[in-house]
Amino acid sequence: MNSLFTSAFSPLAVSLGLLLVMTSAFPTPGPLGEDFKNDTTPSRLLLTTPEKTEALIKHIVDKISAIRKEICEKNDECENSKETLAENKLKLPKMEEKDGCFQSGFNQAICLIKTTAGLLEYQIYLDFLQNEFEGNQETVMELQSSIRTLIQILKEKIAGLITTPATNTDMLEKMQSSNEWVKNAKVIIILRSLENFLQFSLRAIRMK
């Protein structure tokens, strides 16, 4: 009787075993950017590939686009705010020839250092964005979280060659404005500049 029972269920047991192995080997993929949420431990970051880092940057750019779109739905002139850049005196980090991120004179090491330092400088402007943006705060918080994760990944690559700058609360106060149009213009300029900054960094990120 025991022999018959064993022989009858052996194929089922083997099939279940194979199914478990296949499930472990091919996990269900999550949405873009999910791998980077709530996990910035050193061991996790060391396993990050250039492809995953590039995917994270594209995820950040998508969040930037979503915020810009939300603002523009309420303000028809939101994308025509370039002329206010000089007036608002926003000293936003931007790439220059010496930073090694352009095709001409490209230098991966220098570009990674500039990218990391620039993103750290952008933190004060992202704080302004969070304080002034009246739309979906969850999107803004996710943007900030993703950028912090990217900074940690880049710090691993450059082996701590830069330090985190002190928070400039005076600058944050100077950026405040009671004028709704000027406030929205500043937010749009910050988002546009951040997106351009990230696009220039991609060449260094893609290289292994």
Curated annotation (Swiss-Prot):
Described by its record, this protein's role is as follows: Cytokine with a wide variety of biological functions in immunity, tissue regeneration, and metabolism. Binds to IL6R, then the complex associates to the signaling subunit IL6ST/gp130 to trigger the intracellular IL6-signaling pathway. The interaction with the membrane-bound IL6R and IL6ST stimulates 'classic signaling', whereas the binding of IL6 and soluble IL6R to IL6ST stimulates 'trans-signaling'. Alternatively, 'cluster signaling' occurs when membrane-bound IL6:IL6R complexes on transmitter cells activate IL6ST receptors on neighboring receiver cells. IL6 is a potent inducer of the acute phase response. Rapid production of IL6 contributes to host defense during infection and tissue injury, but excessive IL6 synthesis is involved in disease pathology. In the innate immune response, is synthesized by myeloid cells, such as macrophages and dendritic cells, upon recognition of pathogens through toll-like receptors (TLRs) at the site of infection or tissue injury. In the adaptive immune response, is required for the differentiation of B cells into immunoglobulin-secreting cells.
The Gene Ontology biological process terms listed for this entry are: acute-phase response; glucose homeostasis; hepatocyte proliferation; interleukin-6-mediated signaling pathway; liver regeneration; positive regulation of multicellular organismal process; positive regulation of receptor signaling pathway via JAK-STAT; positive regulation of receptor signaling pathway via STAT
Identification of the protein by name: Interleukin-6
Give one Pfam family, short name only.
IL6
Query: Localized where?
Result: Secreted
Q: Which domain of life is it from?
A: Eukaryota
The organism encoding this protein is Capra hircus
Output the InterPro entries linked to this UniProt entry: 4_helix_cytokine-like_core, IL-6-like, IL-6/GCSF/MGF, IL6/GCSF/MGF_CS
Task: Output the lineage of the source organism.
Answer: Eukaryota, Metazoa, Chordata, Craniata, Vertebrata
Keyword list (alphabetical) reads:
Acute phase, Cytokine, Disulfide bond, Glycoprotein, Growth factor, Phosphoprotein, Secreted, Signal
GO CC annotation, single: interleukin-6 receptor complex
Q: Could you say which residues form the signal peptide?
A: 1-29
